[in-house]
Amino acid sequence: MQTNLLKPKTINVEQLGANRAKVTLEPFERGYGHTLGNALRRVLLSSMVGHAATEVTIAGVLHEYSSIDGVQEDVVNILLNLKGVVFKLHNRDEVTLSLRKDGEGPVTAADIQTPHDVEIINPEHVIVNLSHGGKIDMQIKVENGRGYVPGTMRRYGDESPKSIGRIVLDASFSPVKRVSYTVESARVEQRTDLDKLVLEIETNGAVTAEDAVRASAKILVEQLAVFAQLEGNELAAFDAPVQRSSQQFDPILLRPVDELELTVRSANCLKAENIYYIGDLIQRTENELLKTPNLGRKSLNEIKEVLASRGLTLGMRLESWPPAGLDKR
């Protein structure tokens, strides 16, 4: 009797729009379409890393219920419009940006002054409309995070004390806007009781639908891997024989850490600890890296963010690493 479970052999990605795509995988054993589809959907909506405006200071404004002379919108509507700006930070956890403009007409996200490592995905998005003689001057703090974080959770934190004029925003960090899935029938030879999983994903443009699925799947793998490492390794008795000599690693793990484009300080700290490949890096824990001379919390956060953008985290386990023939320099 056949006891091996089928694994998907066909993966198809169909672009439905600029930020929408349909991802189809088949075949699955009966029931696995719903099992995996629901798990992926929940992770996509709740656990993806993204960036959002979290605080704003507007010249001449003391609180969100104010109005500004020469500006058509009140402050509440300005904040709502600001939440619609899609930011993408490269190799940093947070940044404070400036927006200054005067003269009649719309003020868009393209008017925000950004450094080279900050990207605005929707520069045409309107933030305010100025009347004759109007002007706007604001400072916008952008941070990375996961999911939805109400402003009340950070408003009176010890690290960022409440100050007059500082308006704390509710932040929706997730780059995934909508996810739905359906399970259809699939057939392999004479078997007609199989599943086909169809995921339809819409993002805000900061990530592609394919990258979002890839990152969410890796999060699930990392979480489920804990159950395969129960004390006593009792699950090993049920595993199929594995040829360790033919262990295949994700190609990204075999790339040098230089390709992560870390700051010079972070890169030198890693090399000093003989961490040359991404596969070496992800097996280190946060505590281990913090013990590295000259590598502080800021550098650690940079490393974590760069890894997260590739669907990786610190503290992962790799069997049979390093692979035979890998140059350890």
Swiss-Prot record:
Region (Alpha N-terminal domain (alpha-NTD)): 1-231
Domain of life: Bacteria
Coiled coil: none
Keyword Transcription in annotation: yes
Entry keyword set: DNA-directed RNA polymerase, Nucleotidyltransferase, Transcription, Transferase
Location of the region described as Alpha C-terminal domain (alpha-CTD) in the Swiss-Prot/TrEMBL record: 249-329
GO MF annotation: an example: protein dimerization activity
Family label: Belongs to the RNA polymerase alpha chain family.
Subunit structure: Homodimer. The RNAP catalytic core consists of 2 alpha, 1 beta, 1 beta' and 1 omega subunit. When a sigma factor is associated with the core the holoenzyme is formed, which can initiate transcription.
Function: DNA-dependent RNA polymerase catalyzes the transcription of DNA into RNA using the four ribonucleoside triphosphates as substrates.
Comment field on protein domains: The N-terminal domain is essential for RNAP assembly and basal transcription, whereas the C-terminal domain is involved in interaction with transcriptional regulators and with upstream promoter elements.
HAMAP family attached to this UniProt entry: RNApol_bact_RpoA
Protein name per UniProt: DNA-directed RNA polymerase subunit alpha
